[in-house]
Amino acid sequence: MKQLIFLLICLSCGTCSIYALKCRSQEGLSEAELKRTVRNCMHRQDEDEDRGRGGQGRQGNGYEYGYGMDHDQEEQDRNPGNRGGYGNRRQRGLRQSDGRNHTSNDGGQCVAQCFFEEMNMVDGNGMPDRRKVSYLLTKDLRDRELRNFFTDTVQQCFRYLESNGRGRHHKCSAARELVKCMSEYAKAQCEDWEEHGNMLFN
């Protein structure tokens, strides 16, 4: 009886390790290409922020951590007609709560959207497109289990966004929520996630 219990424990431990995916692969999109795209998007976001300040460049040390209102937010509240897509109080509140993890107000959201755009994963309105995201993430993967995981993750995350109405009208927040959702799935399923984390958007 003890041998049977030992055998069952060994088998269950063996099957647990089988289900932990190695999500980092030499197949698929190259890490260098992904990093280059994100860097370009971050650079573009910085330029857009500088233009929004009337060409004055960054004030102070260039880092805004979301502690209270900054100059840009005060300016947006005084000049509500000049929103540029980011001026309403609700969005500002989202940025402030999320701003502790980012060096710019809306940067993480719009960097994510820029990334999807640059990788041709958006629809005609600039919103992340389910089929394009799924195709681009899986087209070069030979490992069937990993390909299925990515496909399922994309499907589940788009369902989540649709069911909660998140980002339906704002492409930056939709992209950011999609990245967050896919990151959570990867964190839960990929054994090599802790080693590398989500280097692109966190």
UniProtKB/Swiss-Prot annotation:
Q: What is its main location?
A: secreted
Q: Where is the composition biased (Gly residues)?
A: 54-65
**Disordered: annotated segments:** 43-105
Q: Which UniProt keywords apply?
A: Behavior, Secreted, Signal, Sulfation
**UniProt keyword annotation of Glycoprotein present:** no
Which family, according to the similarity comment?
A: Belongs to the PBP/GOBP family.
Function of the molecule: Odorant-binding protein required for hygrotaxis behavior in humidity-detecting sensilla.
- The protein, known as: Odorant-binding protein 59a
Q: Which organism is it from?
A: Drosophila melanogaster
Task: Identify the coding gene.
Answer: Obp59a
